[in-house]
């Protein structure tokens, strides 16, 4: 953070303008804008003179000081800064030369203040600004640089305004201070005083205490004699005191060291300046004690066993420290009342502190930190234990307020209760690189190591064994060469929790850990500790302070706990020894936290809903409130202020990335911090199950737990004598990255497989991990560069990317591994191998996996802008041949479309590559964006929509609190004529990834809707194409009024091969393993009888449709039309339809399918919409209620297609009234005259010798209304019960095939919902009887009332649930839910 001026230092208490506006909740006033404008213009001019204006002015880079100052920070994200960048900066360099920096800053400043003036102001309301300032801001925001106001003119306008206002105008700094006060007002007064303390005075005091404490043997040559600390004799402890210490630390003590001042006695407070607000330490350890500056000298002791530090030091004699007692004058007499306070350090050492009852926790804390020689005191605090929970003390808390009653009272015999405090970590950093000192990192290791051993921090068995081996490497060293096999060289209980030992037996665990230790290539010593921290910091419960609570209403399912971290609050359900996260409240979605007696209430700022929890006492309730306040305060501080120290290499990059108010884009171990918005920190953080495992499930406000690293700060104690905060208001934003799969690479060139590929290497690919760890702190600073690349027809963009740890890359993300010689990237002369791609075409890659980044580069336009963070070092290259680069390196090119490549890939990769080629050819043909039909599956595309009447023109479905896998947000329907429909690129089923830079990963449905309803008029969306199986786009109103043509698939043989020789088994066979979720397998199938086509020798079971977001669709290898050959090894050839259905439904949770993909042209395409003709809007039918039971008409036995239907389909099926039936016939007759394609069906199709033929039937079909199409598309239905006319294949010799319409039909009513099949709902199939093998007629149930139909159709879990699908638009009327469909001989479809 830069100082405001050379003589004025920026206060530590500084916040961003965006944070101040979030807390304030309204726009800036006109006077505040003038004040900011004046100070910012002066600051910009000063920075331009000093050539230090390498930043972009935006609400997240503008820092406000509590002293009224203003500065700018340069570590905001590209996503946040992009809307405020000058147009000439976004366009890059031009022929006219470099743009003027001052004019760019003028534009950014004007946009920032204009944004602040319109913060949360509805678009239809004017800004509350007078003409002078409004005109000035508009002039500053001109697109043309020459038309903008210069900075000197802006300053002159501010000066004129100051002269025109009142005689004594308020200074600009006063407005700044008030804005900062709004943010600081959300924390306790104690924390504010801590913030405003003079940092220099703290450092001086800390140095003085340390120098007094650590004088060797009490002899310091340069110290005055009066200040010398002289140790006294070592005395034996009495049995009484010994017993108390044993109770305090659970370890035996034999002796202790007592060091005090010579002649200690009552003293006057005026004799020393240290007797003011801070106590003076009067004792030090005896010279024989181990030096605290080298706490790990004992680690390589050669004993029978090597034991952890916190166990060895716990058995040593305690060290006595003396604090001066407070001078109490009573009736002219002074007296001193000392008590023994036991403080246990993280390394297990016990300190016996002699203190006064009136001493504060801050005095003891300062003395302990000085003794331990810990300089980074921010992360630590003193806590006492109550039950199994730690309660941290505020620095101003007096010990007598929290000590046991027996400790406060003075007994005649001198026996008092023991009062024990523990030094523990309160703020857990996101990564160990953020800690400056190795001793601080060692303290983190010690606490996490012990917490895992004591099972305070949960992790799975595999991770426990891995961490045990790393701890053994750190504390014992490498596996001993002279070790005798089978002989124990360590105590297993010192490294593995008792729970795992009991389950696996001690002998088995000992053998397994020893073997892992022998085979381990991990470093030893401090490097092993860092690797230990790296893994632990990815655990779900890392950094969370957990306290037991109860729900407001007692529930039988179990206990609850509340976890507080720097990102928010997590609600756990306690089941045995495990905690399962059920709800989470990030600060940005927490409006207020309040307490009333024993009740703690959390109010959501997005939904307004209140969540109440009950604690065991009012003090605990207030403590939790203060803890939340301190966590929120610490999050705001770390998110807005500039790093207080300079980092080098990776350290600086990680620190800037972590403390940025924009987002916490950190290195590889920090990938769990998901960026939910571009300027704040978020609660939900996906973690790794273990070091190499997959991600855990996520959740935001409802079920499915999910966690992130937290950092705890000294909070307000519920027991302080002062006023207690009873409610706090919270409003912030979040940050995210997504962890991808390591080991993949992708080449952005054109012919990278045809030439040698360069692989970036730093020192040595096979280098030791020790040198790798040391490089983390010694690399040069990172450069952030912006590069514009133009696609080359030969080399593409000219660089190769990969993801994950490669050589020295220890961060997660998308990295440039090498440059292609002669390519655009190399010609740019700015890109170096090893750099991390932060953004591509103004879209941050922090929310994208490797495959998504590949698709973005493949489908990007010819001009691409890259934001890269790269080291200053030069990387070497390793050349490999084409074979190695494709087989082992996993390289991918945008045009790897040759047959040789496809031969080595899976079937779904073939399809992707073919679609990629089609996309790139389309893009190369012109500059216009590709149409939705041209885009390939999985493509990431960018759309800007301008809201109309406050809506974007589409509705969404999904969310982390719904049953959609991974909690994705999908486009549910497109409103005809709306912004999305006009834009034309968005299709139903596409997945929404980002909205205005805010990632939708991990959001609930309501939160996603809230993001889409943001205050901006223009929404910038990032979507992922979900493939051709997504529902087609909703037709416009004009299309619905016109004719709707029936899509017909014509089957043709492949050229050059006789039709008689074509077989459905010619296609590739492959095996797929699917795991059922709560909704089943996620696909429907049809059974096609052998009489349908000459190429089928038996009945075929084919995949009809894949449901979005379900296991089959998520797997990626299955496509509509695939033939099912076997289920879990059992062939289905010859099985009846019902047997296949039961085989799939009765399968275990994991199902193995043997599939075959038929060659193109052999079988009809599986297009779900081709069998359903529709009526136009003016020909909709009305439904008449029919009482009584009616028997359904008998159906022909010549059904040739049996299409199964999902079990969650509607249950209200009934034949329609006769009048309506006649109307349908009339409608058909009228519409047939207008359809030329209907006539073409009546003639032979000689060009297709083996096309399907329909049976002649006199009756016309009942056409569905256009509402059916609307509902089928908008609701994304997967559960149609359609009884449409079926096709039959009938060979007709040389006459070809003639198509006729079905003979008979009837009407049914169907209510559809977007649900998927569950195997448990097998009995809910509306017409189960029709699926029986011997059934020749389909009895339809009697018609029921509309209310009963809706009630019976809705599953119980969806009624009154907050997780139901919600649209952004008005809900469909209940009457429109019912529709008419044809029900002739069309079979049913079922979903396994």
Swiss-Prot record:
Domain PDZ, first and last residues per copy: 775-861, 950-1035, 1079-1167
Gene that produces this protein: Frmpd2
Name of the featured protein: FERM and PDZ domain-containing protein 2
Main location class: cytoplasm
Highest taxon above the source species: Eukaryota
Subcellular location: Cytoplasm; Postsynaptic density; Basolateral cell membrane; Cell junction, Tight junction
UniProt keyword list: Cell junction, Cell membrane, Cytoplasm, Membrane, Repeat, Synapse, Tight junction
Domain FERM: 342-642
Domain KIND: 15-197
Subunit details: Interacts (via the second PDZ domain) with CTNND2 (via the extreme C-terminus). Interacts (via the second PDZ domain) with PKP4 (via the extreme C-terminus); the interaction directs FRMPD2 to the basolateral membranes. Interacts (via the second PDZ domain) with ARVCF (via the extreme C-terminus). Interacts (via the second PDZ domain) with NMDAR subunits GRIN2A/GLUN2A and GRIN2B/GLUN2B (via the extreme C-terminus); the interaction is direct and is likely to promote NMDAR-mediated neural signal transmission. Binds GRIN2A with lower affinity than GRIN2B.
GO terms of molecular function: 1-phosphatidylinositol binding
Record PROSITE patterns: FERM_3, KIND, PDZ
UniProt region (Interaction with GRIN2A and GRIN2B), positions on chain: 937-1027
GO cellular component: basolateral plasma membrane; bicellular tight junction; cytoplasm; cytoskeleton; postsynaptic density
Domain comment (free text): The FERM and PDZ 2 domains are necessary for localization to the basolateral cell membrane. The FERM domain binds to phosphatidylinositol 3,4-bisphosphate (PtdIns(3,4)P2) and is sufficient for membrane localization.
Record function comment: Functions as a scaffold protein and likely plays a role in N-methyl-D-aspartic acid receptor (NMDAR)-mediated synaptic excitatory transmission. May be involved in synapse formation in cone photoreceptor cells. May play a role in the regulation of tight junction formation. Binds phosphatidylinositol 3,4-bisphosphate (PtdIns(3,4)P2). May pNF-kappa-Blay a role in the regulation of NOD2-mediated NF-kappa-B activation in immune response.
Compositional bias per record (Basic and acidic residues), positions renumbered to this chain: 908-917, 1220-1236
Gene Ontology BP terms: bicellular tight junction assembly
């Amino acid at each position: 953070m830069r100082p405001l001026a050379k003589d004025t230092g920026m206060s530590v208490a500084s916040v961003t303008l965006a944070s101040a506006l979030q807390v304030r909740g309204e726009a800036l006033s006109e006077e505040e804008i003038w004040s900011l404008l004046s100070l910012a213009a002066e600051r910009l001019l000063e920075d331009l003179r000093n050539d230090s204006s390498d930043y972009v002015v935006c609400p997240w880079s503008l820092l406000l000081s509590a002293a009224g100052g203003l500065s700018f920070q340069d570590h905001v994200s590209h996503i946040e800064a992009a809307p405020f960048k000058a147009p000439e900066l976004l366009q890059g360099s031009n022929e006219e030369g470099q743009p003027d920096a001052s004019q760019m800053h003028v534009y950014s400043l004007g946009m920032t203040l204009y944004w602040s003036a319109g913060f949360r102001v509805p678009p239809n309301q004017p800004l509350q600004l007078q003409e002078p300032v409004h005109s000035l801001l508009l002039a500053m925001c001109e697109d043309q640089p020459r038309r903008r106001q210069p900075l000197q003119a802006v300053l002159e306008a501010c000066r004129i305004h100051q002269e025109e206002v009142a005689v004594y105008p308020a200074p600009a700094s006063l407005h700044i201070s008030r804005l900062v006060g709004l943010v600081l007002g959300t924390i306790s007064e104690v924390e504010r005083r801590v913030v405003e303390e003079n940092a220099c005075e703290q450092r001086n005091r800390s140095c003085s205490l340390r120098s007094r404490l650590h004088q060797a043997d009490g002899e310091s040559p340069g110290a005055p004699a009066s200040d010398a600390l002289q140790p006294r004799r070592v005395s034996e402890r009495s049995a009484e005191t010994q017993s108390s210490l044993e109770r305090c630390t659970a370890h035996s003590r034999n002796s202790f060291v007592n060091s005090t001042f010579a002649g200690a006695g009552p003293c006057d407070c005026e004799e020393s300046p240290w007797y003011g607000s801070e106590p003076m330490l009067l004792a030090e350890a005896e010279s024989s004690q181990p030096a605290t500056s080298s706490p790990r000298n004992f680690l390589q002791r050669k004993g029978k066993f090597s034991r952890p530090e916190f166990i060895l030091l716990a058995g040593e004699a305690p060290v006595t420290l003396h604090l001066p007692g407070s001078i109490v004058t009573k009736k002219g007499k002074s007296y001193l009342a000392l008590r023994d306070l036991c403080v246990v350090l993280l390394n297990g050492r016990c300190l016996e502190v002699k203190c006064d009852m009136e001493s504060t926790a801050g005095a003891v804390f300062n003395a302990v930190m000085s003794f331990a020689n810990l300089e980074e005191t921010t992360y630590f605090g003193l806590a006492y234990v109550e039950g199994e929970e730690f309660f941290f003390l505020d620095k101003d808390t007096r010990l007598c307020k929290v000590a046991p009653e027996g400790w406060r009272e003075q007994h005649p015999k001198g026996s008092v209760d023991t009062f024990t405090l523990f030094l523990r970590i309160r703020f857990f950093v996101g990564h160990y690189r953020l800690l400056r000192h190795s001793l601080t990192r060692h303290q983190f290791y010690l606490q996490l190591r012990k917490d895992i051993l004591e099972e305070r921090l949960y992790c799975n068995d595999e991770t426990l064994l891995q961490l045990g081996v790393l701890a053994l490497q750190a504390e014992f060293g490498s596996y001993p060469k002279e070790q005798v096999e089978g002989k124990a060289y360590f105590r297993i209980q010192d490294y593995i929790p008792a729970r795992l030992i009991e389950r696996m037996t001690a002998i088995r665990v000992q053998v397994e850990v020893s073997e892992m230790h022998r085979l381990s290539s991990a470093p030893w010593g401090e490097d092993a500790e860092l690797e230990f921290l790296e893994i632990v910091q990815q655990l779900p419960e890392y950094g969370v302070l957990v306290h037991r609570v109860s729900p407001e209403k007692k529930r039988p399912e179990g206990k609850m706990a509340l976890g507080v971290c720097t990102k928010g609050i997590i609600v756990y359900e306690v089941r045995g020894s495990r905690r399962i996260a059920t709800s989470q409240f990030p600060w940005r979605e927490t409006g207020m936290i309040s307490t009333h007696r024993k009740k703690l209430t959390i109010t959501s700022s997005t939904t307004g809903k209140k969540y109440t929890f009950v604690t065991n006492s009012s003090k605990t309730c207030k403590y939790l409130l203060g803890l939340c306040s301190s966590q929120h305060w610490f999050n705001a501080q770390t998110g807005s202020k500039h790093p207080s120290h300079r980092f080098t290499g990776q350290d600086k990059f990680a620190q800037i990335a972590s403390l940025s108010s924009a987002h916490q884009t950190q290195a590889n171990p920090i990938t769990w911090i998901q960026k939910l918005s571009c300027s704040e920190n978020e609660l939900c953080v996906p973690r790794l199950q273990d070091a190499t495992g997959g991600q855990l499930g996520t959740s935001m406000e409802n079920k499915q737990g999910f966690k992130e690293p937290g950092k705890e700060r000294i909070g307000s104690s519920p027991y302080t004598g002062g006023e207690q905060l009873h409610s706090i208001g919270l409003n912030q934003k979040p940050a995210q990255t997504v962890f991808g799969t390591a080991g993949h690479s992708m080449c952005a060139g054109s012919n990278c497989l045809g030439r040698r590929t360069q692989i970036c290497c730093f020192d040595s690919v096979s280098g030791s991990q020790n040198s790798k760890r040391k490089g983390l702190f010694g690399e040069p600073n990172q450069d952030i560069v912006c590069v514009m690349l133009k696609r080359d027809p030969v080399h593409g963009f000219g660089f190769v990317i990969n993801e994950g740890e490669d050589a020295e890359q220890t961060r997660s993300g998308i990295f440039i591994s090498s440059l292609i010689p002669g390519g655009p990237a190399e010609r740019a002369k700015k890109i170096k191998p090893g750099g991390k791609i932060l953004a591509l075409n103004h879209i941050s890659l922090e929310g994208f996996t490797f495959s998504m980044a590949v698709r973005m580069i493949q489908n990007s336009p010819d001009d691409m802008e890259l934001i890269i963070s790269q080291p200053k070092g030069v990387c070497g290259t390793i050349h490999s041949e084409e074979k190695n680069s494709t087989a082992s390196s996993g390289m991918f090119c945008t045009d790897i479309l040759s047959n040789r490549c496809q031969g080595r890939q899976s079937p779904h990769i073939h399809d992707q590559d073919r679609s990629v080629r089609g996309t790139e050819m389309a893009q190369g043909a012109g500059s216009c964006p590709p149409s939705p039909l041209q885009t390939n599956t999985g493509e990431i595309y960018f759309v800007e929509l301008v809201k109309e009447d406050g809506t974007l023109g589409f509705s969404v479905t999904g969310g982390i609190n719904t049953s959609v896998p991974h909690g994705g947000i999908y486009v549910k329907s497109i409103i005809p004529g709306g912004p999305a429909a006009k834009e034309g690129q968005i299709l139903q089923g596409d997945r929404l990834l980002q909205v205005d830079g805010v990632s939708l990963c991990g959001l609930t449905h309501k939160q996603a809707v809230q993001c889409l309803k943001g205050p901006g008029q223009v929404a910038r969306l990032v979507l992922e194409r979900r493939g051709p199986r997504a529902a087609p786009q909703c037709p416009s109103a004009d299309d619905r009024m016109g004719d709707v043509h029936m899509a017909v698939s014509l089957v043709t043989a492949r050229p050059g091969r006789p039709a008689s020789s074509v077989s459905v088994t010619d296609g590739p066979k492959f095996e797929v393993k699917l795991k059922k979720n709560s909704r089943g397998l996620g696909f429907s199938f049809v059974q096609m009888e052998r009489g349908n086509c000459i190429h089928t020798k038996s009945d075929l079971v084919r995949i009809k449709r894949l449901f979005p977001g379900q296991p089959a669709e998520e797997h990626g290898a299955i496509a509509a039309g695939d033939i099912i050959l076997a289920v879990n090894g059992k062939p289905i050839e010859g099985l009846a339809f019902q047997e296949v259905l039961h085989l799939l439904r009765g399968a275990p949770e994991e199902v193995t399918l043997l599939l075959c993909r038929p060659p193109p042209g052999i079988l009809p395409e599986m297009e779900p919409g081709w069998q359903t003709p529709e009526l136009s809007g003016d020909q909709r039918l009305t439904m008449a209620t029919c009482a009584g039971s009616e028997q359904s008409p008998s159906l022909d036995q010549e059904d040739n297609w049996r299409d199964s239907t999902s079990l969650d389909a509607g249950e209200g099926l009934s034949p329609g009234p006769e009048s309506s039936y006649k109307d349908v016939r009339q409608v058909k007759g009228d519409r047939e005259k207008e359809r030329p394609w209907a006539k073409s069906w009546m003639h032979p199709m000689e060009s297709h010798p083996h096309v399907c033929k329909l049976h002649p039937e006199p009756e016309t079909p009942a056409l569905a209304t256009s509402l059916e199409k609307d509902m089928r598309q908008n609701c994304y239905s997967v559960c149609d019960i359609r009884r449409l006319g079926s096709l039959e294949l009938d060979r007709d010799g040389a006459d070809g095939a003639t198509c006729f319409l079905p003979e008979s039909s009837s009407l049914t009513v169907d209510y559809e919902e977007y649900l998927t099949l569950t195997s448990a709902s097998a009995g809910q199939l509306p017409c189960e009887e029709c699926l029986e093998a011997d059934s020749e007629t389909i009895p339809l149930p009697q018609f029921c009332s509309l209310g009963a139909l809706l009630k019976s159709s809705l599953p119980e879990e969806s009624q009154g649930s907050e997780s139901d699908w919600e649209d952004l638009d008005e809900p469909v009327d209940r009457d429109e839910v019912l529709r008419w469909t044809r029900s002739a001989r069309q079979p049913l479809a079922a979903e396994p």
